[in-house]
């Protein structure tokens, strides 16, 4: 008896943590993960078939961890992990810039399809200005930076598009337009690289010629910020002109300005977006140019120079509420740092995000640490913090809802019991992703299946009732007992949910 009591006592903290997290688990929460390719040699060392299998394995594990969105890098250094008529194939895909995969395939097309099959969003991640990532990289003679060198700057051994040139802004917008028009992505995502980061104590100083040409006597800092502002405004308009439902998200460095620089700033002492990268991210949110911000709070909770806890509160209080706010957390630092009687900071950070009224989710840096189960990160997310399925936050006018599904009924597929339903007439799966003129924001793109046991209250706000999010019109329910109730809803391109279907009761 004492032994049983001892075991129960040992389990109680774990059980209480699980049930506390379960009770707080929201139905709507952005749960993303970054999958970068820059610096990741595993892609170039695989055959196309192995690359596809690897991507599927990463997506499977992120799905297991409870993620509902993937931010996949497709343009790390003015190159492409997709079929492009504008830029060369990426070195990080094949080992040589401009070399196509053999046999040919399209990673972006593939990852969009596979993410959507798992009920996950796909955000196409581009670095806008970076051309090279190291001093060792040699660009071909016909590269645009060699053909029009005046449009580029060199700093710290790297090459960048000069943000001052209107031609560069239009070039980047054309890249975005091509991607948005041809691929069924959910968002365009830029990271934190705008004007180059300082190289140690040396700040960026390589734009003297363009300042002399375009500066018109303006304060240089203001002029640089204006150059980046123009790009963000142009990219935003470009996206919305093609597909209004495709979102534009930015993941900036985690500090806007320090309070020592600006009384509106945060209690921090690190590098600053506004002053060092010339990125006025709060302005972009206020102007409505971006749909979400995901500041990179990659530090430990109470690091003196950059305390994630205080910074999360600061972003919550200062980002315009019409712009969605997600927090980017570093998995490795989170799992390495014990806090109080907890072995890591994971539960505290998840709880922190959920406690802040304007924070609508998290993004994990990087996804490979999740899929690799770094110090149990995947296990803890899957079993506790993201144990129940969650829908990404809705955008736009939420009074508008998509068409509901009809004819929900029990059936059998390949000997398995299933719940199936009829697709709405405007189901997006019936429309080619390239046929932009036929697409609407209200097109249903996936379906949510709810399960309630006999006698259980029907509550569609309870995420514990969600058993599947799928673009298909059937789910397996082999173990459904008599009296179980199933309800299905549609989700449109803006993540808005339809009215519920009729109830299907297992006889």
Residue ranges: model-predicted function:
Residues 167-175, 181-267, 271-296, 302-311, ...:
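Active-site neighborhood of glycoside hydrolase catalytic domains
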Residues 80-95, 130-156, 192-216, 260-271:
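Aromatic- and acidic-residue-enriched segments that line the glycan-binding/catalytic groove
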Residues 376-441, 495-507:
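Pro/Thr/Ser/Gly-rich low-complexity, intrinsically disordered linker/stalk tracts
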Residues 278-282, 286-304, 321-398:
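Substrate-binding cleft of secreted/luminal carbohydrate-active enzymes
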